[in-house]
Amino acid sequence: MAGTIEVLVAGGQADPGPPLGPELGPTPVDVQAVVNEINDQTEAFDGTEVPVTIDYDDDGSFDIDVGVPPTAALIKDELDFETGSGEPNEEFVADMSAEQLKTVAEQKLPDLLAYDTRNAAKEVAGTCVSLGVTIEGEDARTFNQRLDNGEFDDVFAEAEPAA
């Protein structure tokens, strides 16, 4: 490959302007073709910031690799709020259900070190602490303890590896 460009774009909403245009302009690739391909591959993340890597050759060919959005962005998108709490241990901005936590954990699982959705959910819950988001009406750390104690086995049962 002749080069690599890494950018964050709004899912399904990339355009030839910044940050893509200035990065792609000096390269041999068709900028609009790259933009269209990025939008096709990121439309499921509509509006959420998504990391994208573009590898290109001197002949104008290119490959696009779409990453998973940051955990905080997935949580904000799932719960529909803009910014986390300035005082996350004192002021809470949203409450997440166990089902919503599972949804975010499943989306993020490929990027995490967790080996199943239950453990991915515990990692996502850690981000909830930083954002000031409660889970099932309580602090995310308390939720993780309850999850370890099996209180949410019904929600995460299908995520367990087959025995």
From Swiss-Prot:
Pfam families: Ribosomal_L11 (PF00298), Ribosomal_L11_N (PF03946). The keyword Transmembrane does not apply. GO terms for cellular component: large ribosomal subunit. Residues 1-25 are annotated as: Disordered. Keywords: Ribonucleoprotein, Ribosomal protein, RNA-binding, rRNA-binding. GO terms for biological process: translation. Belongs to the universal ribosomal protein uL11 family. Forms part of the ribosomal stalk which helps the ribosome interact with GTP-bound translation factors. Part of the ribosomal stalk of the 50S ribosomal subunit. Interacts with L10 and the large rRNA to form the base of the stalk. L10 forms an elongated spine to which L12 dimers bind in a sequential fashion forming a multimeric L10(L12)X complex. This is Large ribosomal subunit protein uL11. The lineage of its organism: Archaea, Methanobacteriati, Methanobacteriota, Stenosarchaea group, Halobacteria. The gene is rpl11.
